[in-house]
């Protein structure tokens, strides 16, 4: 059975006491996955203020990552979290390039590229988010746009900095499908995940896991996860409810198949 990556992004949600209650629930609901990381890997990207309690309470079948990281070691960068701080917390995974970081906080391709390199050069597993706007999608330019995002994000990256397939994961999240209730068709998502995998292979000569994100929920996750070229999902709103998130975790091929 092919391994699936189930990742949740809490965004700016959950106070520490809420995070603690959540972790109790998700631990209980995923107990049967202990020792089964070869078929399901669960990662929760939490706000930095929740990291301590979430990481303290998590059981072995769950990983906790951070939603952002700056590419400088230290300095006068008010409000930022350096890659050294991420390492000091033993946070193995970090999100880079999410559309909300690109759009709201004006992170351009050069900043995304620096973050990718900082992560990979310092032993942090990078989940790189890419995806097109609704305008780009309607103009039929999705493939060209996303391939260009990947080229720019991976400029100067060497496969020597990638020791295993989990060091670099790409999440395809069409912007028009994030938090809107609109869902990219599973066939289109499958095709784009193949496009992305092929582009990374062309650039780095390695195969990387490619996930889909964008209004993923417990109703559509099964269809998405059964697609050949989709290695997992990056879940937003539905990851805030441990019951719903657990249903997504168990979607797709049943364990043992």
Which residues make up each language-model segment?
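Active-site loop-to-helix "anion-binding N-cap" substructures in soluble metabolic enzymes
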Residues: 1-257
């Amino acid at each position: 059975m092919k391994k699936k990556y189930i990742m949740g992004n809490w965004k700016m949600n959950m106070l520490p006491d809420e995070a603690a209650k959540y972790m109790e629930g998700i631990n209980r609901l995923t107990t049967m996955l202990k020792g089964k990381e070869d078929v399901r890997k669960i990662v929760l990207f939490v706000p930095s203020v929740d990291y301590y309690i979430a990481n303290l309470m998590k059981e072995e079948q769950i990983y906790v990552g951070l939603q952002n990281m700056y590419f400088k070691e230290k300095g006068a960068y008010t409000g930022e979290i350096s890659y050294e701080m991420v390492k000091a917390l033993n946070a193995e995974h970090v999100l880079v390039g999410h559309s909300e970081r690109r759009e709201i906080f004006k992170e351009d391709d050069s900043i995304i590229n620096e973050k990718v390199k900082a992560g990979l050069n310092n032993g942090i597993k990078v989940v790189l988010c890419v995806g097109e706007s609704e305008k780009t999608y309607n103009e039929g330019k999705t493939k060209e746009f996303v391939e260009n995002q990947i080229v720019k994000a991976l400029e100067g990256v060497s496969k020597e900095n990638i020791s295993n397939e989990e060091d670099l994961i790409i999440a395809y999240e069409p912007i028009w499908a994030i938090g809107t209730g609109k869902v990219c068709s599973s066939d289109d998502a499958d095709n784009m995940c193949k496009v992305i995998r092929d582009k990374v292979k062309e650039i780095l000569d390695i195969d990387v896991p490619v996930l889909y994100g964008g209004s993923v929920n417990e109703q559509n996750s099964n269809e998405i996860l059964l697609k050949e070229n989709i290695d997992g999902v990056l879940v937003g709103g539905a990851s805030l409810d441990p019951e719903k998130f657990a249903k997504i975790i168990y979607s797709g091929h049943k364990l043992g198949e």
